[in-house]
Amino acid sequence: MSVTIKDVAYIAELARLSFTDTEKEKMTSELNAILQYVEKLDEVDTDGVEPLSSIHDEVNVLRDDVRQESVPNETALLNAPDKLDRFFRVPKVIG
């Protein structure tokens, strides 16, 4: 399979991209190089090779949920430019 300049122009039109003739030629040659590489990969003998979805055997390695002390409200609010009771006050950003 190979890509033609006409194919590149069509795909560019679908993507609402505009290329010069030189860019179309370059894109055509680059896409053809990629397709040639993929065809080479297709020639590799993979009989007996188990398909992988990941190179790691581990799945969802998570740490245990351990309760930790957090910063006290008073300490967190020490440098707050504006506060109300135990909350930060921020400027209104939504009308």
Curated annotation (Swiss-Prot):
InterPro entries assigned: Asp/Glu-ADT_sf_sub_c, GatC
Enzyme class: ligase
Reaction(s) catalysed (UniProt annotation): L-glutamyl-tRNA(Gln) + L-glutamine + ATP + H2O = L-glutaminyl-tRNA(Gln) + L-glutamate + ADP + phosphate + H(+); L-aspartyl-tRNA(Asn) + L-glutamine + ATP + H2O = L-asparaginyl-tRNA(Asn) + L-glutamate + ADP + phosphate + 2 H(+)
UniProt-listed SUPFAM superfamilies: Glu-tRNAGln amidotransferase C subunit (SSF141000)
GO biological process: glutaminyl-tRNAGln biosynthesis via transamidation; regulation of translational fidelity; translation
Keywords in alphabetical order: ATP-binding, Ligase, Nucleotide-binding, Protein biosynthesis
Its EC number(s): 6.3.5.-
Presence of keyword rRNA processing: no
A molecular function (GO) term: asparaginyl-tRNA synthase (glutamine-hydrolyzing) activity
Chain's role: Allows the formation of correctly charged Asn-tRNA(Asn) or Gln-tRNA(Gln) through the transamidation of misacylated Asp-tRNA(Asn) or Glu-tRNA(Gln) in organisms which lack either or both of asparaginyl-tRNA or glutaminyl-tRNA synthetases. The reaction takes place in the presence of glutamine and ATP through an activated phospho-Asp-tRNA(Asn) or phospho-Glu-tRNA(Gln).
NCBIfam families for this protein: gatC
Assembly: Heterotrimer of A, B and C subunits.
UniProt cross-references to HAMAP family, sorted A to Z: GatC (MF_00122)
Family named by the database record: Belongs to the GatC family.
Name by which UniProt lists this protein: Aspartyl/glutamyl-tRNA(Asn/Gln) amidotransferase subunit C
Gene giving rise to this polypeptide: gatC
